[in-house]
């Protein structure tokens, strides 16, 4: 989406855009890894994400708004086998590592869109 928006082109969505994804800022991932390395927890697994599901359509609309463009996404046929729902359960990381994501999707999008 970012490349298309930088070229002032509509983002392309495959399917209806109802697919749910869990987006997280790389700084939050790094902080979670540092917490895990510095913890006393051994031989455990953690899901690291925002814990918030966002549809692809919603993501595209957020990015368009931040870009201040007057465009709409283009819809193309869905990709066979595409996962409909993917959202992390981060309770284990919250409880064992005392970790929470700090950067919202909107903040992260503003950062990357305004940076590039």
Please place each PLM-identified region on the residue numbering.
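A short C-terminal helix-loop "cap" of Rossmann-like NAD(P)-dependent dehydrogenase/epimerase domains
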Residues: 1-13, 66-76, 91
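Generic structural signal for alpha-helix termini and adjacent loop/cap motifs
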Residues: 4, 8, 36-40, 96, ...
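Glycine/proline-rich active-site loop of Rossmann-fold NAD(P)-dependent oxidoreductases
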Residues: 9-18, 26-27, 35-47, 52-57, ...
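Conserved catalytic core of Hanks-family protein kinases
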Residues: 17-20, 99
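Residues that recognize and position ribonucleotide moieties
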Residues: 22, 52, 86
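Conserved C-terminal active-site "lid" loop/helix of NAD(P)H-dependent oxidoreductases
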Residues: 26, 45, 77-100, 104-107, ...
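Hydrophobic "lid"/C-terminal helical patch
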Residues: 33-37, 60-63, 90, 109-116
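Polyanion-binding surface elements
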Residues: 54, 62-65
């Amino acid at each position: 989406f970012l490349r298309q928006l930088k070229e002032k082109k509509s983002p392309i969505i495959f399917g209806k855009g109802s697919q749910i994804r869990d987006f997280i800022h790389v700084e939050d991932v790094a902080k979670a890894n540092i917490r895990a390395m510095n913890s006393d927890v051994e031989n455990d697994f953690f899901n690291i994400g925002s814990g918030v599901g966002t549809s692809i359509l919603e993501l595209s609309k957020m990015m368009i708004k931040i870009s201040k463009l007057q465009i709409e996404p283009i819809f193309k046929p869905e990709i066979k086998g595409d996962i409909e729902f993917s959202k992390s359960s981060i309770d284990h990381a919250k409880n064992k590592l005392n970790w929470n994501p700090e950067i919202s999707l909107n903040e992260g999008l503003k950062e990357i869109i305004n940076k590039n």
